[in-house]
Amino acid sequence: MFRLLLNLLRHRVTYRFLVVLCAALGYASLTGDLSSLESVVCSILTCSD
């Protein structure tokens, strides 16, 4: 298991995959935060749909 982890850490493709994965998760989190922020603002300002 440890040897497999070391082999994965040596490859650049693994780092690219992790960067893409983190970016995708960050984007999903950001859109979720924006929708919840929109709900809060609309509840305060009584937005019309």
Curated annotation (Swiss-Prot):
Keyword Signal: yes
Signal sequence coordinates: 1-23
UniProt entry keywords in alphabetical sequence: Signal
Entries under Pfam families matching the protein: DUF5465
Top-rank taxon: Viruses
The name this protein goes by in its record: Protein 19.5
Source organism of this protein record: Escherichia phage T7
Taxonomic classification: Viruses, Duplodnaviria, Heunggongvirae, Uroviricota, Caudoviricetes
